Amino acid sequence: MRCGPKGLNMIVIDGSQGEGGGQILRTALSLSMVTGQPFTIEKIRANRERGGLLRQHLTAVLAAAEISGANVTGAELGSRTLTFAPQRVTPGDYSFAVGTAGSATLVLQTLLPALMLANKPSNVVVEGGTHNMAAPPFDFLAKTFAPIIESMGPKLKLTLDRYGFYPAGGGKITAEIEPVEKLKQLELLDRGEVLQQNAVALLAHLPRHIADRELETASNILGLAPESTRILGTKNSAGPGNALMIEVQTERHTEIFTAFGKVGISAEKVAEEAAVAAAQYVASSAFACEHLADQLLLPIALAGGGSFTAVRQTMHARTNIEIIRLFLPVSFEISEEENCARVALSTRDRAGVSA
């Protein structure tokens, strides 16, 4: 193992391992800022068609470097190797722009762990994509992810200032973060009964019939009443866009399932994708959908304990676990139950990470 600044060991990461995508880099950046451990990542996004750093990943690197005063090499578009050596995290007011439709929500999620464990509040503005494929949409962040983070202690106020769809981008989100010294441990095993399901067709600068067809298809699959569906039209975006969002409210949790409109894909297919995912979640007894399950791993590891149930565990999540283990003395125990997977943290030091 190489030696990094401040006498700390340089963690070396193979970016081609597991699912080999951008989450490996984002998790490493988050944990490097929190723990102070430097890292080098090689073969960045090796399993993607366009490997190396894209604009979204580069923005996350530069944002993390600014917040933590890091020394960085390899921070350029297309780079497949990066070294990141953080100094001290400085909370405050920050503004970052992806410059494309690359995900603003993923950039924000990269920065959150360090800022929610800082010694002062922060205000972060990120411009880019707010509703695009292969990333959590703003609604998921605000209604599904943020409430769980707040139950761990930090205060997190999220505002959607402007929509950003692929390919125009131009969206804007603001996060107001009040940190805590240490995160509370959570046991997210039982979601309770399903109380309600709603479908929202989001439409920007596109014909209404698209939304009508999506809602009709979703209603047929999920058995939704007319009062449980609505069209949300917006002109507050730089370009056209469409998404169908299914909101599943349970006694203790809300999940959002989203599918995005795309040229060449029928409105019916878009609706089917979101509705089937929602139906699979409802049919399980899991607290978390597979996407939330991946995003719970890091905060639970930082809290030093906790567990949750998920619809299923993915290669994405298993890869994330391996990266977390490089920075923290933890491991996760995964067991299959009747119609869900149970994930629990095990660690040699259950004290957790504090500021």
From Swiss-Prot:
GO molecular function: ATP binding; RNA-3'-phosphate cyclase activity
UniProt cross-references to InterPro entries, sorted A to Z: RNA3'-term_phos_cycl_insert (IPR013791), RNA3'_phos_cyclase_dom (IPR023797), RNA3'_phos_cyclase_dom_sf (IPR037136), RNA3'_term_phos_cyc (IPR000228), RNA3'_term_phos_cyc_type_1 (IPR017770), RNA3'P_cycl/enolpyr_Trfase_a/b (IPR013792), RPTC_insert (IPR036553)
The UniProt record lists the keyword Signal: no
GO cellular component: cytoplasm
Active site: 316
Keyword flag Ligase: yes
Localization per Swiss-Prot or TrEMBL: Cytoplasm
SUPFAM superfamilies (alphabetical): EPT/RTPC-like, RNA 3'-terminal phosphate cyclase, RPTC, insert domain
Major localisation: cytoplasm
Listed GO biological process terms: RNA processing
Positions in coiled-coil regions: none
Catalytically driven reaction(s): a 3'-end 3'-phospho-ribonucleotide-RNA + ATP = a 3'-end 2',3'-cyclophospho-ribonucleotide-RNA + AMP + diphosphate
Keywords, comma-separated and alphabetical: ATP-binding, Cytoplasm, Ligase, Nucleotide-binding
Protein family according to the UniProt entry: Belongs to the RNA 3'-terminal cyclase family. Type 1 subfamily.
Protein name: RNA 3'-terminal phosphate cyclase
